[in-house]
């Protein structure tokens, strides 16, 4: 365990630095999700690696016998967490965790959700709106684009109350959002 007052890396870098296929796929994901750099991608890969490692360990324990006691509790907690973040469907089991891809984690970032909900035209613009304080969840300003959004929070993502983006005449506001505000 690391010293509590010291920051430690929350990601692992690739094993080999120059693999053309891996680098090309990373660039595509960085562009698609509007990430600032590959470090953000590596963080999501590390989160996914941790989930899958826990699932593998629990499946190995269940191979000896059915999940009982602490193992069953831990498996239920892992599934509950992944279902709460909408990474897995509600009828999923521990085997489904092994089939997860990086995109499942990246889709749950606040930056991606703002773009998917139509509050921004592009993923990069969504990142800018978040860092500039134009986005709120449950009325509270959020300025972290990499925040993982739960299913409940997803319903409450909106423009911050005092943000100039709340005005339908703002030039950077997407047209469909402005039209829905005028109708209300």
Swiss-Prot record:
Belongs to the universal ribosomal protein uS4 family. The gene is rps4. CDD domains: S4. InterPro entries: Ribosomal_uS4, Ribosomal_uS4_arc, Ribosomal_uS4_CS, Ribosomal_uS4_euk/arc, Ribosomal_uS4_N, S4_RNA-bd, S4_RNA-bd_sf. GO terms for molecular function: rRNA binding; structural constituent of ribosome. Keywords: Ribonucleoprotein, Ribosomal protein, RNA-binding, rRNA-binding. Part of the 30S ribosomal subunit. Contacts protein S5. The interaction surface between S4 and S5 is involved in control of translational fidelity. Residues 163-184 are annotated as: Disordered. It comes from the Archaea. SUPFAM superfamilies: Alpha-L RNA-binding motif. This is Small ribosomal subunit protein uS4. NCBIfam families: PRK04051.1, uS4_arch. One of its GO terms (cellular component) is small ribosomal subunit. One of its GO terms (biological process) is translation. One of the primary rRNA binding proteins, it binds directly to 16S rRNA where it nucleates assembly of the body of the 30S subunit. Residues 108-172 form the S4 RNA-binding domain. PROSITE patterns: RIBOSOMAL_S4, S4.
């Amino acid at each position: 365990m690391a010293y509590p007052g010291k920051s430690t890396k929350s990601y692992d870098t690739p094993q080999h630095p120059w693999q053309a296929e891996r680098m090309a796929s990373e660039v595509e994901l960085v562009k698609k999700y509007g990430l600032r750099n590959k470090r953000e991608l590596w963080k999501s890969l590390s989160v996914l690696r941790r989930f899958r490692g826990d699932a593998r360990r629990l499946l190995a324990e269940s191979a000896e016998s059915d999940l009982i006691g602490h193992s069953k509790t831990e498996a239920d907690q892992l599934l509950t967490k992944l279902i709460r973040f909408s990474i897995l469907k509600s009828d999923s089991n521990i085997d489904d965790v092994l089939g997860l891809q990086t995109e499942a984690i990246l889709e749950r970032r606040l930056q991606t959700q703002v773009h998917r909900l139509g509050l921004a035209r592009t993923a990069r613009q969504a990142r800018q709106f978040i860092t500039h304080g134009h986005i709120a969840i449950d009325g509270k300003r959020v300025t972290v684009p990499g925040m993982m959004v739960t299913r409940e929070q997803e319903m409450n993502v909106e423009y911050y109350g005092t943000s100039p983006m709340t005005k339908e005449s703002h030039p950077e506001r997407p047209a469909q959002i402005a039209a829905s505000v005028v109708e209300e």
